[in-house]
């Protein structure tokens, strides 16, 4: 795609114009594309800024609109709105994956559909708009594009999909087997509690409890993700599954 057409398509998709076109170019450049290319900028620093701008805009919006909600309630709603899965939903709505510059290897392994890559691009795009047009325009852009997610968060209709996140991370290095095993359940039928463990490559990586099997599996996946991070087994190259 020619560069002029690229910018026009992206601006049309986002319904916004950029004064500095290079900002959106950088926002849509994955680090894998820049490897070995001297002087090519990629979007990781912009992700950092975009994350902060998004948090501020959503915080201000919730604070002004929902005056009766407590600090704890507002914090919980914000975390749902700005979580990776919500950003992924926005990215899919834009179909932004097709515009991302990435290495052939990243593309072959499903990079254009990867939750983390798409979510990071949304943050980088927000940063690009903020740098190019300032806070007021960025806030309006965020509210316009996140309004459905904000509404779902207020209605408690957002579920954090930790299982998908765990699967994407551990399978970066190949088709590594993940298994969720129901350990036991207890309590009456109307208030039954389920206990689940998750195994990655036959290693127990996390456990979770919930009032449905699905909830207990999500909590087990969340526990596994926390352990992978804290034990430094999770990194950009994948996960060490050889430990016993």
Swiss-Prot record:
**Top-level taxon:** Bacteria
GO terms for CC?
Answer: cytoplasm
Entries under InterPro entries matching the protein: dsRBD_dom, RNase_III, RNase_III_dom, RNase_III_sf
Which residues are the active-site ones?
51, 123
Subunit description: Homodimer.
State its role. Answer: Digests double-stranded RNA. Involved in the processing of primary rRNA transcript to yield the immediate precursors to the large and small rRNAs (23S and 16S). Processes some mRNAs, and tRNAs when they are encoded in the rRNA operon. Processes pre-crRNA and tracrRNA of type II CRISPR loci if present in the organism.
Q: What is this protein called?
A: Ribonuclease 3
Q: Which organism is it from?
A: Clostridium kluyveri (strain ATCC 8527 / DSM 555 / NBRC 12016 / NCIMB 10680 / K1)
Q: What is the lineage of its organism?
A: Bacteria, Bacillati, Bacillota, Clostridia, Eubacteriales
What gene is this protein a product of?
rnc
């Amino acid at each position: 795609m020619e560069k002029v057409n690229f910018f026009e398509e992206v601006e049309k998709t986002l319904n916004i114009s950029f004064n500095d076109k290079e900002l959106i170019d950088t926002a849509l450049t994955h680090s894998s594309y820049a490897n070995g290319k001297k002087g090519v900028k990629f979007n990781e620093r912009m992700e950092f800024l975009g994350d902060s701008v998004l948090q501020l805009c959503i915080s201000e919006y919730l604070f002004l609109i929902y005056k009766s909600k407590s600090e704890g309630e507002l914090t919980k709603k914000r975390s749902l709105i700005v979580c990776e899965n919500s950003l992924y939903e926005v990215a899919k709505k834009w179909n932004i994956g097709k515009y991302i510059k990435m290495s052939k290897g990243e593309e072959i392994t499903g990079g254009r559909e990867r939750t983390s890559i798409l979510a990071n691009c949304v943050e980088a795009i927000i940063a690009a708009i903020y740098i190019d047009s300032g806070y007021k325009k960025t806030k309006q852009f965020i509210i316009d594009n996140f309004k459905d997610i904000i509404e779902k968060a207020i209605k408690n209709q957002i579920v954090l999909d930790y299982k998908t996140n765990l699967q994407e991370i551990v399978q970066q290095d190949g088709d590594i087997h993940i298994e969720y095993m129901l350990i036991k359940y207890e309590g009456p039928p109307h208030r039954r509690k389920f206990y689940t463990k998750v195994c990655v490559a036959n290693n127990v990586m996390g456990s979770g409890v919930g009032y449905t099997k699905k909830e207990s599996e999500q909590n087990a996946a969340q526990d596994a993700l926390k352990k992978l991070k804290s034990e430094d087994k999770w990194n950009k190259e994948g996960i060490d599954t050889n430990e016993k």
